[in-house]
């Protein structure tokens, strides 16, 4: 008979404070401790910025403001769902006139606890291991299994979105970005020595969850619905069947022994940020997918430049410190399946209200370390998606659909992200210095320092990058952006559009 162990807090094993090296190891595979994959000679935003400040004589003027203009888009119609926003005030107990909440901010501290402002409270809505689908077992730290984890709430939440059902019920979508096996399993060292069941549990703890929540009376509190049918609840993991859609689907670079069609893939990995579409689906972003692969040193030579550009090691001991998913699923060994890595690094679209519909990896939005996806409608109701590649010295992207959004037309809107134009940003700072005087008057060149341009990479039928087909642009997006002179950035993450002007 198995003894039930009481639910307890995660053992921290002495790891405390800030962004520790242990966190870096599990979250992004120590990305910042390796050479940046972008070895191009493209201009760096920091150099452009410094040159702008120098021209304006910052030290003499005392203040500088740089505006980066981009495609002006109108704010999306009130979406079926959306993340909430609150505005605090840093100067004391009196809120800014435009604040929605009145609170005194929490002072910086190193307390090992969740601290909220005075007169506020916090509650746990859902936690790792909580049952998600009907029939899922209660969490048992000492007796975990992959079968149970596939039905339970995953690990390390990131992006969260809220989808109302009615005035008292809603769905939450939650990304499960990565796993800390050293906290999940007693005595864990690394993937090479881990029990195979532990590796399967880790794979099941990745991905995302859809859970139903409900209001608690009139308290303002929400809680997890734990009884009844819960028809929308589901888990998405590293082994959930998904579709590859868009112009790159079916290309030879996406074909594998297990999927000769190049249109079916199992799972999503390291999902970080995301966004909500006007038609009520969630876009979830695959970020540091490179860390899950081994065997790059044995991959075909012609594939190695692209692997390295995506941060995948092609020399040395690629298995050291790795989670070693390849021990239970050999597709993660690139010496055996070199194209498998090309099937990760996409924006994944999921409809939380259709639990039997497969998630879709939208290749038209490019392949890189997606951090998030900010969706807006243009003035003519096409869909614009703004994206950042969260890697040192990588780029900012934009997608604009060919077709227009149709409210209420689910079938039509499901096609919007498969056809359009993908752009990458190039920033400049070349206005005449003596005409930048702080008055607000445009200089002779018609733009202030700090402007930029969107460079088209491809649309669904045509590549605008010499030497690249459309599919190659969408699969090797970083290399295509290198080729057109995109501006290197400092790990661009979230990108937002002004609700007042529509500019990003």
Tell me what each language-model feature is.
Residues 1-53:
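N-terminal secretory signal peptides
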Residues 51, 57-84:
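N-terminal export signals
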Residues 111-127, 135-148, 218-262, 350-368, ...:
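Blade-edge beta-strand/turn elements of extracellular beta-propeller
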Residues 156, 270-271, 343, 369, ...:
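Beta-rich catalytic cores
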Residues 196-202, 206, 219-234, 394-480, ...:
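Beta-propeller fold recognition
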Residues 196-240, 271, 275-332:
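Carboxylate/His-rich catalytic cores and anion/metal-binding grooves
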Residues 206-214, 343-352, 400:
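Beta-propeller blade signature
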């Amino acid at each position: 008979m198995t003894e039930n162990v009481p639910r307890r807090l995660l053992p921290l094993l002495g790891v405390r404070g800030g962004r520790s090296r242990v966190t870096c190891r599990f979250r992004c595979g120590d990305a910042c401790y390796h050479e940046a994959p972008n070895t191009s000679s493209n201009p760096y935003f920091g150099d452009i910025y410094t040159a702008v400040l120098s021209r304006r004589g910052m030290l003499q003027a005392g203040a500088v403001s740089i505006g980066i203009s981009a495609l002006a888009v109108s704010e999306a119609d009130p979406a079926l769902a959306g993340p909430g926003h609150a505005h605090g005030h840093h100067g004391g107990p009196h809120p800014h006139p435009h604040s929605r909440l009145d609170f005194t901010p929490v002072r910086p501290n190193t307390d090992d606890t969740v601290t909220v402002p005075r007169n506020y409270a916090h509650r746990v809505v859902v936690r790792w291991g909580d049952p998600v689908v009907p029939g899922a077992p209660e969490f048992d730290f000492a007796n975990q299994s992959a079968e149970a984890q596939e039905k339970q709430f995953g690990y390390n939440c990131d992006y969260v979105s809220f989808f109302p059902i009615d005035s008292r019920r809603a769905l939450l979508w939650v990304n499960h970005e990565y796993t800390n096996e050293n906290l999940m399993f007693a005595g864990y060292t690394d993937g090479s020595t881990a029990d195979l069941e532990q590796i399967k549990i880790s794979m099941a703890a990745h991905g995302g969850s859809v859970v139903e929540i409900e209001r608690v009376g009139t308290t303002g509190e929400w809680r997890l619905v734990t009884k009844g049918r819960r028809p929308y609840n589901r888990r998405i993991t590293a082994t959930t069947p998904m579709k590859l859609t868009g112009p790159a689907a079916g290309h030879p670079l996406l074909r594998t022994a297990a999927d000769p069609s190049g249109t079916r893939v199992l799972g999503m990995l390291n999902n970080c940020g995301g966004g909500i579409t006007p038609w009520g689906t969630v876009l979830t972003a695959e970020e540091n997918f490179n860390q899950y692969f081994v065997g790059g040193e044995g991959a075909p030579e012609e594939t190695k430049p692209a692997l390295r550009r995506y941060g995948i090691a092609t020399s040395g001991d690629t298995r050291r410190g790795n989670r070693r998913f390849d021990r239970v699923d050999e597709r993660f060994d690139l010496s055996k399946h070199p194209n498998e890595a090309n099937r990760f690094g996409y924006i994944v679209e999921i409809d939380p209200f259709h639990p039997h519909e497969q998630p879709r990896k939208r290749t038209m939005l490019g392949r890189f370390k997606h951090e998030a996806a900010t969706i807006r409608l243009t003035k003519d109701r096409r869909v614009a998606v703004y994206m950042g590649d969260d890697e040192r010295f990588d780029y900012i992207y934009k997608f604009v659909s060919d077709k227009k959004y149709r409210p209420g037309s689910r079938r039509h809107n499901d096609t919007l992200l498969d056809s359009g134009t993908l752009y990458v940003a190039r920033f400049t700072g070349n206005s005449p210095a003596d005409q930048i005087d702080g008055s607000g008057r445009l200089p002779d060149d018609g733009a202030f320092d700090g402007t930029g341009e969107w460079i088209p990479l491809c649309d669904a039928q045509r590549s605008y990058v010499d030497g690249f087909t459309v599919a190659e642009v969408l699969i090797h997006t970083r290399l295509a952006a290198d080729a057109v002179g995109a501006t290197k950035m400092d790990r661009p993450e979230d990108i937002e559009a002004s609700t007042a002007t529509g500019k990003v």
